[in-house]
Amino acid sequence: MGIESFIKDKRKTKDILVMGHVVCGYPSFEENFSALEIMEDAGVDLVELQFPFSEPSADGPLFVKANEMSIKSGTTVNMCFEFMSKVTKRFSFKVLMMGYYNTIFQLGEEAFLSRLKDSGGEGYIIPDLPVEEATKLHTLSRDLDLDPIILMTQTSSDDRLKKLGESSSGMVYAVARKGVTGSKTTMDESIDSLISRCRANTSVPLGVGFGISSKSDLDFLKGKADVAIIGTAALQAWETSHAIGYKNFFESLQIS
């Protein structure tokens, strides 16, 4: 079952789905696995496994640090794929690769997609790859039933959103505000407007991310978006209180 069908099926019984995020190898793969166990117990539906990169341009300070520390500890792309394989065999949530195009470029597009497929991934999120430069990659992806997740932003023109919508597959990642990940996003009419504009340009499910951090944020998105994407707030909870803080954070969202 692809991402689109998976989300639509789960939405029959859930007002909104939740997608979590870990940076592979930070603080360690063992702690990643513990975090994923907590997420599954809390009812998380999808998870991004971020392959660390030295210049994560879409990420805020906390994730930049996580990427840097993971690389310094010796994390490799091969280790990330091996971890993904372990994760997809163990957990029921769907797994997406998140990263930057340099990772794909270094492997080669066909080799990257083959490894992703073999590791049980459902698709990928590459925020620094414009759709105009991704035609071949997206075609190869769909031949393997892998979904390239497209990002839509508030600053995109209607013509741009239409073009992005035509390239969308699996789900769309609606970026809730300008800038990088990490800062709190105010849930207001600007988010409603973004969601409406995205909906007008794609028929695939819609996820909203960047600054989603609380149950009230999830409640705001219910009936509007299909997936709430949570990254920095969860990692901050781990940084502050490790597994206990992480568990308390996800329990506070009351996902299930």
Predicted features along the sequence, with ranges:
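N-terminal amphipathic alpha-helix/helix-capping segment at the start of soluble metabolic enzymes
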Residues: 1-21, 85-88
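Active-site beta->alpha loop and helix N-cap motifs at the rims of alpha/beta catalytic domains
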Residues: 46, 51-53, 64-129
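C-terminal helical cap(s) of enzyme catalytic domains, especially alpha/beta-barrels
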Residues: 59-67, 235-256
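Short beta-strand/loop segments at the ligand-binding rim of alpha/beta enzyme cores
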Residues: 13-19, 90-100, 141-151, 199-210
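Catalytic cores of alpha/beta
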Residues: 29-41, 156-167, 208, 212-228
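Glycine/Thr-rich beta-alpha phosphate-binding loop at enzyme active sites
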Residues: 65, 73, 151, 161-200, ...
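Glycine-rich phosphate-binding active-site loops on the catalytic face of alpha/beta enzymes
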Residues: 44-55, 123-125, 129-133, 172-182, ...
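Catalytic beta/alpha-barrel core
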Residues: 72-75, 120-133, 147-156, 162
